[in-house]
Curated annotation (Swiss-Prot):
Compositionally biased region (Basic residues): 178-190
Protein's recorded name: ADP-ribosylation factor GTPase-activating protein AGD10
Annotated source species: Arabidopsis thaliana
GO BP, one annotated term: embryo development ending in seed dormancy
Gene: AGD10
Keywords: Acetylation, Coiled coil, Golgi apparatus, GTPase activation, Metal-binding, Phosphoprotein, Zinc, Zinc-finger
Localization per Swiss-Prot or TrEMBL: Golgi apparatus
Pfam families, per the entry: ArfGap
Polar residues composition-biased segments: 140-162
Length: 395
C-alpha cells in the first residue's frame, strides 16, 4: 500500500510540475518549488513554506513534495487545485501577488477557496465508492488540462439517467405502508359495538352436552413399600426422598395434638432425643426410679431444716471434723480478735528465727494492741458490774 501511494505521488507531482504555472512559487515566484500547501493546492518555496507553517495547520497545511508521504485525498487536493486556478480565484476577490501573506490566507476569499476544494475532493471520493468516474471541476475553472470536456458530458448523461430512474423507485415505500395498514382497518366493525365479536357459522353438536365430565384424578398417598419401589425406578435426582416415612410421621397432626402429660413431677425426668426429624420418648430405667425415691426421702428428712449442707444431703457427714471445729471455735468465744496462728494451732508464742525486724515489730505491735483491747474489755465489764452493784445498794 505504501509503495502504491509512493508511485502515485511521484506520477502526480511529475505531471503537475510539468505545467509552467506550477514551476514557480505561488507567493514569491521563486523557481522549482519543492513544498506545497495541501489546504489550497499550491506550490511553495522553502521560505514561503515556513511562513505558511507559522500561520498554523488550521490555516495552511504544508508538506514537502519529495520527503513527506502523501495520502490519496491530499494528492486530489493538489490535482483539483494548482497555482493557476488559485491565482485566478484570488484575483476575482481583489488579491494580487503582492501584499501581506497572513492577511491574504485569513481572508474570506481564502476560506471560500478552501471550502470549494474540500467539496470537490469529497464528491470525487463518493463517486469512486459508487464505481463511477470522478467528476472534474467545470471547464471554466480547470486550466490544468488534467480532464477533458468529454468526461464531463458523460458524467452529466449518467446523472440524468439516475434522475430518470429515481421516480420509479420512490413510490415503492408508500405501497408497502398501505398494504400493512389494511389489516388494521379491517378490524374496525361498527355493528358489533367495537368489540370485534363475530357470529358463529357452525353449530355445536348436541352430543357434547351428553358427555360425562372427566373426573379429577385423586393423588393417593403411597405406602413406604410402594415409595421405595418407585424410588428405585426414578432417576438419581429423586434420591432426596429417603426419609419419606419419617417426614410423614413428623408432619402428621397426632404428634402435636396428642402429647401425653408427664407421669412424674420432675421436669428433667423424661429425656427427649432427635431421631430422623421427630422426638422419641426414652424409657424410664431403674436408676431414674431410684433417684425419685431418694429425692422423696431427702424431702421428708429436711422438711423442717433451715439449711442443708452437701455432706448432710449425700450422707458424708464427718462428726469428728465438726467436733474439732466446734472445740476450736469455743476457745475464742470471749476474745475480740483471732489470728490465723491461733486458729490453726500455730500460736505457741515463739517467733521464728527467720523473721525480719520489721515483721517482728509488726507482730509485737499487733500483740500489744490485742492486749490493750482485752484490758479495755475487762475494764468495761468491771465498770458495768460495779454500776449494777451500786445501783442495787442505793435501791
Amino acid at each position: 500500500m505504501a509503495s502504491e501511494n509512493l508511485n502515485d505521488k511521484i506520477s502526480v507531482f511529475k505531471k503537475l510540475k510539468a505545467k509552467s504555472d506550477n514551476k514557480i512559487c505561488f507567493d514569491c515566484n521563486a523557481k522549482n518549488p519543492t513544498w506545497a500547501s495541501v489546504t489550497y493546492g499550491i506550490f511553495l518555496c522553502i521560505d514561503c513554506s515556513a511562513v505558511h507553517r507559522s500561520l498554523g495547520v488550521h490555516i495552511s497545511f504544508v508538506r514537502s513534495t519529495n520527503l513527506d508521504s502523501w495520502s490519496s485525498e491530499q494528492l486530489k487536493m493538489m490535482i483539483y487545485g494548482g497555482n493557476n486556478r488559485a491565482q485566478v480565484f484570488f484575483k476575482q476577490y481583489g488579491w494580487s501577488d503582492g501584499g501581506k501573506t497572513e492577511a491574504k490566507y485569513t481572508s474570506r476569499a481564502a476560506d471560500l477557496y478552501k471550502q470549494i476544494l474540500a467539496k470537490e475532493v469529497a464528491k470525487s471520493k463518493a463517486e469512486e465508492e459508487l464505481d463511477l468516474p470522478p467528476s472534474p471541476p467545470d471547464s471554466t475553472q480547470v486550466p490544468n488540462g488534467l480532464s477533458s470536456i468529454k468526461t464531463s458530458e458523460a458524467l452529466k448523461e449518467s446523472n440524468t439517467l439516475k434522475q430518470q430512474e429515481k421516480p420509479d423507485v420512490v413510490p415503492v415505500s408508500p405501497r408497502i405502508s398501505r398494504s400493512v395498514k389494511k389489516p388494521l382497518g379491517a378490524k374496525k366493525t361498527g355493528k358489533t359495538g367495537g368489540l370485534g365479536a363475530r357470529k358463529l357459522t357452525t353449530k355445536s353438536s348436541g352430543t357434547l352436552y351428553d358427555q360425562k365430565p372427566e373426573e379429577s384424578v385423586i393423588i393417593q398417598a403411597t405406602s413406604p413399600v410402594s415409595a421405595k419401589s418407585a424410588r428405585s425406578s426414578f432417576s438419581s435426582r429423586f434420591d432426596y426422598a429417603d426419609n419419606v416415612q419419617n417426614r410423614e410421621d413428623y408432619m402428621s397432626p397426632q404428634v402435636v395434638s396428642h402429647v401425653a402429660p408427664p407421669k412424674s413431677s420432675g421436669f428433667f425426668e423424661e429425656e427427649l432425643e432427635m431421631n430422623g426429624g421427630r422426638f422419641q420418648k426414652k424409657p424410664i430405667t431403674s436408676s431414674s426410679k431410684l433417684q425419685i425415691q431418694e429425692t422423696d426421702e431427702a424431702r421428708k428428712k429436711f422438711t423442717n431444716a433451715k439449711s442443708i449442707s452437701s455432706a448432710q444431703y449425700f450422707g458424708n457427714d464427718n462428726n469428728s471434723a465438726d467436733l474439732e471445729a466446734k472445740s476450736s471455735l469455743k476457745k475464742f468465744s470471749g476474745s475480740s480478735a483471732i489470728s490465723s496462728a491461733d486458729l490453726f494451732g500455730d500460736g505457741d508464742g515463739d517467733f521464728p528465727l527467720d523473721l525480719t525486724a520489721g515483721d517482728l515489730l509488726n507482730r509485737l505491735s499487733l500483740q500489744a494492741q490485742q492486749d490493750i483491747s482485752s484490758l479495755k474489755n475487762m475494764a468495761e465489764e468491771t465498770k458495768k458490774k460495779l454500776g449494777s452493784v451500786a445501783s442495787s445498794l442505793w435501791v
